[in-house]
Structure formats: C-alpha cells, structure tokens
C-alpha cells in the first residue's frame, strides 16, 4: 500500500479530503484513526460510512508492519526489529532526544565492506507506508521529532518510495524538513530530484575516504562519483536549502584514519557548508575491522576542528545491543562472512 492507495481507500468509504487528512494525521501520530480532538468528537466530524469502515482500514494499516522485538540499550536508545507483512524484517532505532533511524530496503545492493546489511545483498524494496509504519510503531513508544533514513538499505535505490515517505512525514506527519535526513552514498538522481520536492530533507553523504580508489573498494557498488564531485554536488544542494550537508565517515583503524586522509577532508570540506561526522566502527564477534583507539579518535576530531572543519563524533546508538546497521537482523537470520580491505599507512 502506498500513500495514494490509503487516500483512495478512505475516499471509497466516503471521506472527503478534510476527513482523510485528519485520519492520516492520527495514524502518523500513533493514535486511533477516529481519535477525537479536545473540541470535536469523531461522530460530529466523520461521516457514518467512514466511521463504520475505519476498523477495517485500521486492521490493514496494522498489517503493514508489526514490532517483532525491542532491545533497549544503556545509552537511552532502543533498537526495534520490525516484521513486515511478508515476514521480512528490518531495523529501526529509537535515538535519544527524539530521533528515529528507519530502514528503506530489506538488505542493500551497495555492498559496503564494513556494513552488515550489505552482506545479504538486496532482497526487496521497502514501501513508502512500510517506512512510515516504522515511525508509527516508534511513536507509540515515545515522541519522534526527527527521522533519519540511515537504516538498512540505500535510499537512492528506492527513491520514489523514500521521497513519498518524506513528503508524508514532512506534511501530515508534522516533522520539520530539516529533521528529515536523507542518507546516500551519492547517486546523481538524488541531486536531480531533491531540489524539486515539496519537502526538501537534510542530506547526509557517505564519504568514508577522500581517495577515490579506496572509496571504490570500500563502497564497491556506489555510483562512480569522485569524492570531489560528491562534495561539489552536496554543496550546491546545501546552498539551495540553506542547511549544511552531513558527511559520514566510518572510522576503520588502519584503513581511513590516517593524517593523510584527514588532510584530504580539509582539502575537500574547508570553507564548505558542511559537518563531518566521524563514526567509530561498531564491531561484532569475528570482525575483520576495528575502530581506532579512543585517544586516536579525539586526536582526529581536534585535528580537523582546529583547522576549520566542524567535526563531531557519532557513535552508533545501542552499541551494547548490536547497534550497527543490520546487526540485529543478522543475528536473527545469520550473515555472510565479512571481506577485509587492508591499507598500508604511510
């Protein structure tokens, strides 16, 4: 079911656009579809035919996704394993301070060598209402004021569904446009489509290396944009929407944590409308990769920050409960072994 299908379903019951908007907003807030307001009861607003049909509609919406299991973490986050109607599972993560990370695909085709999700390949796309349903399930547990499309999958490979979900959340869902974050490895179609959207989300770009060849090996199926081209396209969008690009950099010890790489970041991002997010790798048992030592991470942040690039450390939420993308699902269903890329540091 997509957004237009839901509106048509309600229209078939006799709902006018005003009725549809109220019902959809109630669902997006995790409330009953016929939830009343302080001033108006449902029976005084919704036609009888609509009220009689809502239980069936509610049943259909509940069937889109259900919570399979919840895994609270010590940092205040909570990882949700969500089961879709065909019994495929995706992950959502409730973040501290009102954030939620949602999945856009079951699996992923990009095949980032340090990502658990990519090991299974792409199994199927997640529909727009399946993404929104992840928000609904989360809102039944706590307030959600920000949604980041950074979970399982590459949003650019499911662009129509992701943009539809963003539009719905940024309108009837009541989430500010800056608080909807589209994360991508850098598909040219993203830079073509986002500027023309009614809801223009913030953009997070997966950089991970300033060396084009190393980035190609780390992200083997990403579009063939050079780091320079990626940053240039990001800067253009940032100036159009007037909020900075978030650049993502998963820190891998001995792979992309050298000063040469940090100098590459300075070369690309100094003077840009950008924030660099350094993300220490979240390892699992038997991993081929490790995160740098804590002292090293602090050194890198200071090195970049003191030279003019706003830099933050973004630890994966829920590190004590399989916090990395796809890890919870992988433990539940098994995963393929990890490939390892070695880099000689100068």
Curated annotation (Swiss-Prot):
Keyword Metal-binding: yes
Subcellular localization(s) per the UniProt record: Cytoplasm
EC number: 2.1.1.-
GO cellular component, one term: cytoplasm
One matching Pfam family: Radical_SAM
Record-linked PANTHER family: 23S RRNA METHYLTRANSFERASE, RADICAL SAM CORE DOMAIN-CONTAINING PROTEIN
Record protein name field: Probable RNA methyltransferase PSPA7_3453
């Amino acid at each position: 079911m997509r957004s237009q299908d839901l509106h048509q379903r309600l229209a078939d019951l006799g709902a006018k656009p005003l009725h549809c908007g109220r019902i959809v907003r109630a669902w997006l807030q995790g409330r009953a579809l016929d939830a009343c307001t302080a001033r108006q009861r449902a029976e005084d607003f919704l036609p009888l035919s609509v009220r009689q049909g809502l239980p069936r509609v509610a049943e259909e919406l509940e069937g889109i996704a259900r919570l399979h299991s919840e895994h609270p973490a010590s940092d205040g986050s909570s990882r949700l394993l969500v089961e879709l109607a065909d019994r495929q599972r995706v992950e959502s993560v409730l973040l501290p301070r009102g954030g939620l990370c949602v999945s856009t695909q079951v699996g992923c085709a990009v095949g980032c060598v340090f990502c658990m999700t990519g090991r299974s390949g792409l199994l199927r796309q997640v529909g727009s209402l399946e993404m929104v349903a992840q928000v609904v399930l989360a809102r039944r547990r706590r307030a959600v004021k920000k949604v980041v499309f950074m979970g399982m999958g590459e949003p650019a490979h499911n662009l129509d569904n992701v943009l539809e979900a963003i539009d719905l959340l940024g309108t009837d869902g009541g989430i500010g446009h800056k608080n909807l974050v589209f994360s991508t490895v850098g598909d040219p179609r993203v830079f073509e489509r986002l500027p023309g959207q009614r809801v223009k989300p913030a953009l997070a770009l997966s950089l991970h290396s300033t060396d084009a060849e190393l980035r190609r090996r780390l992200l083997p199926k990403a579009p063939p944009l050079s780091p320079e081209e990626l940053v240039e396209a990001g800067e253009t969008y940032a100036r159009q929407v007037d909020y900075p690009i978030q650049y993502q950099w998963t820190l891998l010890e001995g792979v992309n944590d050298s000063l040469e790489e940090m100098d590459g970041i300075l070369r690309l991002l100094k003077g840009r409308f950008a924030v660099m997010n350094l993300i220490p790798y979240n390892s699992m048992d038997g991993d081929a990769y490790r995160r740098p030592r804590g002292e090293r991470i602090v050194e890198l942040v200071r090195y970049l920050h003191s030279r003019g690039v706003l830099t933050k450390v973004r630890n994966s939420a829920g590190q004590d409960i399989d916090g990395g993308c796809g890890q919870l699902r992988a433990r539940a269903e098994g995963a393929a072994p990890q490939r390892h890329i070695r880099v000689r540091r100068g």
